[in-house]
Amino acid sequence: MNTALAQQIANEGGVEAWMIAQQHKSLLRFLTCGSVDDGKSTLIGRLLHDTRQIYEDQLSSLHNDSKRHGTQGEKLDLALLVDGLQAEREQGITIDVAYRYFSTEKRKFIIADTPGHEQYTRNMATGASTCELAILLIDARKGVLDQTRRHSFISTLLGIKHLVVAINKMDLMDYSEETFTRIREDYLTFAGQLPGNLDIRFVPLSALEGDNVASQSESMPWYSGPTLLEVLETVEIQRVVDAQPMRFPVQYVNRPNLDFRGYAGTLASGRVEVGQRVKVLPSGVESNVARIVTFDGDREEAFAGEAITLVLTDEIDISRGDLLLAADEALPAVQSASVDVVWMAEQPLSPGQSYDIKIAGKKTRARVDGIRYQVDINNLTQREVENLPLNGIGLVDLTFDEPLVLDRYQQNPVTGGLIFIDRLSNVTVGAGMVHEPVSQATAAPSEFSAFELELNALVRRHFPHWGARDLLGDK
């Protein structure tokens, strides 16, 4: 047991009291991102080290690993606490998304350490999808780079409203206030183009030396703001899903015996209570909630984020992927939508292609009708493109094989977020955030069926010498 944990348990008056206190602490999920070698893994290692979250055997192992793989000379290479893959240690970079947990007396934290290399941008998007705050590291020697802009845009696209710009390696710039001010102004100029109402904070620090990470730096008397840890402990995260309308995607129909039929899943938003009138979509059939079953017994009500099983008063046809919501709410099913896409495959996304998609437990097929634009991450301008390349970000029009019940991603990430799956390899090739569902009344009628468009795209791709015309292009 490490000393910090032992001290916390002693302060609470025993293990049982400490465990109860842990349950009532708020949880903050955040990620670290930025360009390669900006010091993301070192920063997380410093946070764990300075909050005394490292066990003695880990510290001993870290000393040995620093001698073998370290990049800091005689000093401890704190990045090795996070870079666990052999390839990461040998190259001195982060490849996969690494998750770490730690807690202080004020809050619990889950950290996602994301890679900085451009070819691993897809990993960064994966890490950002569950986070509420992003720490954007900037090397004080280099300033704002393309990857900084890319990660900032992806973070805001995925609904993150709190950005902490950590200007790292200030020790290599002699802790210059002028350097900090210049980078701060450069980033604010860029951030003015980012969508949404953002909470942006700036902290000058040195992850290697520990300046302004968990304790105030004596080398930067000109900075009177909070340390990075103080920002993480005090930032107010508003859980918008609690105030949103009820959304309950069915993940599993639980039928252990003839006397029980329940619908299991995680309440995506809002609240549900026993006796509430609910509606099942897309069928539109209504019923009442008879029971709310959890792992520790029945409940009278449940809130967003809780895993529950709902039992209804009527035996109606409900399958995996169906959506339960309040009976008095109107949410029409749509067959088309404009979707913000982060493309993750080497084979580019092109109009006419079809993919399997998964959204809130529902799996179906979608066709790419067109690409409206790709975002240039250098200046956030929009440009017309024929296809969306690896790591490209753009707005795409999709048509689904069947009507779906969708929310805008910014309103509800669960019922507004989807993934693209290659139908041959079964590999996830893209992430999508619903920008705007298109109602049946406003959707343009299609002259050709989904099968005809898919066959046309297949022929043009593999048999170009046949000279088949582009049905989408001729519309």
Swiss-Prot record:
GO terms for molecular function: ATP binding; GTP binding; GTPase activity; sulfate adenylyltransferase (ATP) activity. Residues 92-96 are annotated as: G2. Residues 206-208 are annotated as: G5. This is Sulfate adenylyltransferase subunit 1. Keywords: ATP-binding, GTP-binding, Nucleotide-binding, Nucleotidyltransferase, Transferase. With CysD forms the ATP sulfurylase (ATPS) that catalyzes the adenylation of sulfate producing adenosine 5'-phosphosulfate (APS) and diphosphate, the first enzymatic step in sulfur assimilation pathway. APS synthesis involves the formation of a high-energy phosphoric-sulfuric acid anhydride bond driven by GTP hydrolysis by CysN coupled to ATP hydrolysis by CysD. It is an enzyme of class 2 (transferase).
